[in-house]
Amino acid sequence: MSFLQKFRKFAMRGNVVDLAVGIIIGAAFGKIVSSLVANVIMPQLGLLIGGIDFKQFSWVLKPAQGDTPAVVMKYGIFLQNIFDFIIVAFAVFCIIKLINRNASQRGGKTRRAVQTECGRDAAYRDPRSLETTKQRHGAGYNDD
C-alpha cells in the first residue's frame, strides 16, 4: 500500500472526520462566545461598574517618544479573554453533565462509570484492553 493510500485510509476513518468536525464547530462556538462577551456581557458589566470600557484598560510601560510608539500592556483585553474561557468551560461542563445524565437515564453506563466499577483502566472489559493492561502491569495480572 502506498503512502498516499495509507494517508487516505487514515484520514477517512470515522475518528479523524469526527475530530475535524468537532474542531470546526468548536472554532465557530468560540467566535460566538467571544462576541457574546465583547458585545453583551462586558458592556453591561462596565455599565454596572460606572461606564467603564474594559477593552481600554491598559498600563503604559514606556511612553511614546517621537516616532517610537508607546509600549502598552492591554490587560482589559486579557480580562475579556478570561471571561471567554470561563463561558466556554461552563458550556462544555453543562454539555458533559447533560450527556452523562442522559446516559444514566437510559440505563447505559458512561466509560468513566465502567472504569470506576472495574477499579482499573480496562474499559468495557474489552479483551484488547485487558491485553494492554497486562502489558502495562505485567504478565501476572488477571482480570478477576
UniProtKB/Swiss-Prot annotation:
Sorted UniProt keywords: Cell inner membrane, Cell membrane, Ion channel, Ion transport, Membrane, Transmembrane, Transmembrane helix, Transport
Subcellular location: Cell inner membrane
InterPro entries: Mechanosensitive_channel_CS (IPR019823), MS_channel (IPR001185), MSC/AndL (IPR037673), MscL_channel (IPR036019)
Principal location listed in the UniProt entry: membrane
Record carries keyword Membrane: yes
Pfam family for this entry, one: MscL
GO molecular function ontology, one term from the record: mechanosensitive monoatomic ion channel activity
Compositional bias (Basic and acidic residues): 118-134
GO cellular component entries: plasma membrane
Membrane topology: Multi-pass membrane protein
Bilayer-crossing regions: 21-41, 76-96
Region feature (Disordered): 105-144
Subunit structure: Homopentamer.
Record function comment: Channel that opens in response to stretch forces in the membrane lipid bilayer. May participate in the regulation of osmotic pressure changes within the cell.
Family statement drawn from the similarity comment of this UniProt entry: Belongs to the MscL family.
Protein name: Large-conductance mechanosensitive channel
Species for this entry: Sodalis glossinidius (strain morsitans)
